[in-house]
Amino acid sequence: MLLVGTPLCEQLCAQEQPLHELPVRDVDISYQITQPSQRTIVQRRRWLASERVVRMDGPGQSATIFDRNAHEITVLNLANRSYLKLEGTPRLPLDPERGKAPARGSQSVIAGLECVDWTWTEDVETHTVCLTSDGVLLRHVVDGQTLMQARSVSYAAQPPELFRVPQGYEPALAPGGGPGH
């Protein structure tokens, strides 16, 4: 997705190449995630670029599917074969507050790919993301601490069925006791 027509475009559209905020082709990424006061985990994210859908699989018995076109989040419980659908779209890593454009920084090589750092301050936190020219997030740093960094990246077609509720899964109860669609 290009940033044309957004507040970020004022600064970024002047760059020699357009900045993509989401991957523009299918990709499978393994990240090391380090949250303060928590153990480090490995998370797999697979993008179906044509449909703007991402599937995140962590170390537990669940997966989360974010459908940006439908503004829908689906949580799959792999252990009991159930799912919960919620409305919403998560913020993108490169998503500063309105009116705050990120500054272009240095280039890096992470997981064998070149990326460019983009930095901005939000509230009191300084965020830096390193993005490839085709929109793959390779690193996210907040206040000098690396929260997320790619360990491996594989460009390959992703099977669309990975981004759907599997057959045989039942709706889970939503918070408040009602069924998730």
Outline where the language-model segments fall.
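N-terminal leader/targeting segments and the immediate start of mature chains
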Residues: L2-V53, A157, E161, V165-H181
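Ser/Thr- (and often Asn-) enriched beta-sheet segments in non-cytosolic proteins
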Residues: D28-T34, T40-R44, V109, T119-T121, ...
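Mature soluble domains of exported/periplasmic/lumenal proteins and thiol-rich metal-chelating peptides
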Residues: V27-I33, T74, L78-R91, K100, ...
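Short, solvent-exposed secondary-structure boundary motifs
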Residues: S30-T40, V53-G58, R91-G99, D117-T121
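A generic structural signal for short, solvent-exposed coil/turn residues
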Residues: T6, E21-P23, S37-R39, L48, ...
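Extended beta-strand-rich segments in extracellular/periplasmic secretory proteins, especially
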Residues: V24, P93-V141, Y169-A172
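An acidic-aromatic
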Residues: Q43-D95, T126-H127, V136-V153
